Amino acid sequence: MQPTIKSYNGWPASKDQAEIGVKSFKVKGTHLKLRCAEKVAPLLCGFASEFHHLIEPLDVGSLDDWGFAFRDVRNVPGKLSNHASGTAIDLNSSRHKLGQVGTFAKGEVPMLKALAKKYGLTWGGDWTRPDEMHFEVSIGPAKVAELITKLGLEKSE
């Protein structure tokens, strides 16, 4: 049975991770695993791998990189975060704290935005309340499948 609740971006959400296909997926080239929805894992993990190699290394052992979390959007009761559907990740959160601006070097921001766009993601650093650690799927299931094929991404493990 499909969950009837949805996260902010319209993807199915549930407290039961198995119900929406949330699992731990390895980020290629790192020791990190992210908990995210299987349907979007190639995009989120592919992005995280390129982020690690091109923007900054993902911290190993600092526990500041994550995906799935069943919760509301901060300060917006009743609106489920995209973390609740396994379609959002936070990377290096101890370096890029919620509300802080300019946590990335100016030269990194254009590449960061281009990478996010390449993978069909929105970057929280562009929001009115900046969340520079945050990246979320901004396209629907059909476009996700199409983009995974176009980018030649393998099914995440």
What residues fall within each predicted segment?
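Active-site-adjacent loop/helix surface patches within enzyme catalytic domains
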Residues: P42-T87
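Active-site acidic/histidine clusters and adjacent loop/turn architecture
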Residues: M1-L58
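Generic preference for well-ordered secondary structure
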Residues: V27-H31, N75, H96
